[in-house]
């Protein structure tokens, strides 16, 4: 088991090295989109399932509270947190609509949807993207593997950050790092620091 544990660290490190080569430009573009969204008085909605739901909530918490610097709260909503709404929609309609119906109610032109799915094939996240597009929102998608069906929904103004891995755990680990990179870029662009390199 010790070797298996060490292998997990090694594979995680290698996936991050591969991601460091493949992803910086798309992360930078996504962060720039988010900055412009926030400067325009808009908000970021985030969704995902399981660990990706946790990532959506993590991102929202970093914006609403703070990441690493003291600054005013920034508008972000995780669509994964309201159990009454989620269970009502799931019960009365379908699980595939738990995010899309919220987006149709809350999303405005100029808002961004942060759509997170390791496979790119989560039905409710795909429906969320379709709803966001119908509301003239832009999309930042965090995916992995081959991008799945989500990759096919990306428009010219949208950004996909696709982790170069087929292993769900490794993709999730990089998604968290991507979220931290987005938060850091947003903070450092909107609120430059004297010690900024």
Curated annotation (Swiss-Prot):
Source superkingdom: Bacteria
Pfam families: SIS_2
SUPFAM superfamilies linked: SIS domain (SSF53697)
Alphabetized PROSITE patterns for the sequence: SIS
Location relative to the cell: Cytoplasm
Signal peptide region: none
UniProt-recorded Gene Ontology molecular function terms: carbohydrate derivative binding; D-sedoheptulose 7-phosphate isomerase activity; zinc ion binding
UniProt-listed GO biological process terms: carbohydrate metabolic process; D-glycero-D-manno-heptose 7-phosphate biosynthetic process
Domain SIS: 34-196
Cofactor(s) the protein needs: Zn(2+)
Primary location: cytoplasm
Protein's UniProt keywords contain Kinase: no
Keyword line: Carbohydrate metabolism, Cytoplasm, Isomerase, Metal-binding, Zinc
Enzyme Commission no: 5.3.1.28
Reaction catalysis annotation: 2 D-sedoheptulose 7-phosphate = D-glycero-alpha-D-manno-heptose 7-phosphate + D-glycero-beta-D-manno-heptose 7-phosphate
Ligand binding (substrate): 49-51, 62, 91-92, 117-119, 122, 172
Pathway: Carbohydrate biosynthesis; D-glycero-D-manno-heptose 7-phosphate biosynthesis; D-glycero-alpha-D-manno-heptose 7-phosphate and D-glycero-beta-D-manno-heptose 7-phosphate from sedoheptulose 7-phosphate: step 1/1
Cofactor binding note of this UniProt entry: Binds 1 zinc ion per subunit.
Family in the record: Belongs to the SIS family. GmhA subfamily.
Additional information: The reaction produces a racemic mixture of D-glycero-alpha-D-manno-heptose 7-phosphate and D-glycero-beta-D-manno-heptose 7-phosphate.
Record text on subunit structure and interactions: Homotetramer.
Stated role: Catalyzes the isomerization of sedoheptulose 7-phosphate in D-glycero-D-manno-heptose 7-phosphate.
Protein name: Phosphoheptose isomerase
